[in-house]
């Protein structure tokens, strides 16, 4: 479908979905992230995810408004 727009490296086991959206620059604030996720605008690995606290791990692909972010494991 869409192309991988950017890859975000995490240095922990996981990053919560709302924090990832902010970190990746897909939204400006935690409040905006919460609204987007709870409104069904965010997909994780191709499926709509409405849990903003979802743990995203290396290999997960997050989509929002046609933008795609892949989570990678940093060193």
Model segments located where?
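Short, Lys/Arg-enriched N-terminal segments with co-localized hydrophobic residues
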Residues: 1-4
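C-terminal structural segments of small proteins and small subunits
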Residues: 48-75
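A basic, amphipathic helix-loop patch mediating RNA/tRNA/ribosome contacts
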Residues: 13-58
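Short, contiguous acidic and Ser/Thr-rich linear segments
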Residues: 8-12
């Amino acid at each position: 479908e869409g192309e991988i727009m950017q890859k975000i490296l995490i240095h922990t086991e996981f990053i919560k979905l709302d924090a990832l959206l902010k970190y990746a620059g897909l939204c400006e604030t935690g409040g905006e992230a919460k609204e987007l996720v709870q409104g069904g605008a965010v997909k994780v690995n191709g499926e709509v995810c409405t849990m903003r606290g979802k743990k995203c791990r290396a290999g997960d692909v997050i989509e929002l408004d046609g933008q795609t972010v892949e989570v990678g494991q940093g060193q």
